[in-house]
From Swiss-Prot:
Protein name, per record: ATP synthase subunit delta
Gene (name only): atpH
Species annotation: Bacillus mycoides (strain KBAB4)
Chief localisation class: membrane
Alphabetically ordered keywords of this record: ATP synthesis, Cell membrane, CF(1), Hydrogen ion transport, Ion transport, Membrane, Transport
Gene Ontology terms, MF aspect: proton-transporting ATP synthase activity, rotational mechanism
Family according to the record: Belongs to the ATPase delta chain family.
Places the protein is found: Cell membrane
Amino acid sequence: MSNGIVAKRYAVALFKIAKEKHVLEMFEEELRLVQNVFTKNGELHSFLTQPNISKEQKKTFLANVFASVSESILNTLYILIDNKRIDILPEIANEYVVLANEERNVADATVYSIRLLSEEEKLNIAEAFAKKTGKDAIRVKNVVDEDLLGGIKVRIGNRIYDGSLQGKLARIQRELMKNR
């Protein structure tokens, strides 16, 4: 079975527990924290995938490192260790966020711009794209892309809204080529 399918199953199980306990936000924050630690620390990943280190040692280590997370998240980490699936943790976190966003009718947007946007600009973009997408809210993450000449590009899910100067120039060029 592919890692994506397995990750989705774990995410769905966590999502059901979170809904039952009314802790969608808390689980999301904890999963993002754990995901962040895993992706930024290659030594942690190496330690947890080392076959000569016992599962109990790995679990004790996880309990110490992630003492602040809920029992459900910690137990999920233990199960991943037992099933030798700890490497799919980032995918599980991403799948969980998708499920939680769907439940709350929220979307995550990555906004590419030539400079950091102010909070007011982020808010305006979030409001405009919430209306455009039919979502209750949009959470904006700003990424500076110095290759843009001007304007912004917004990525929500697998859709890209290109309001950059480069995008406009490319559309004009296509239009001119089409009319030849």
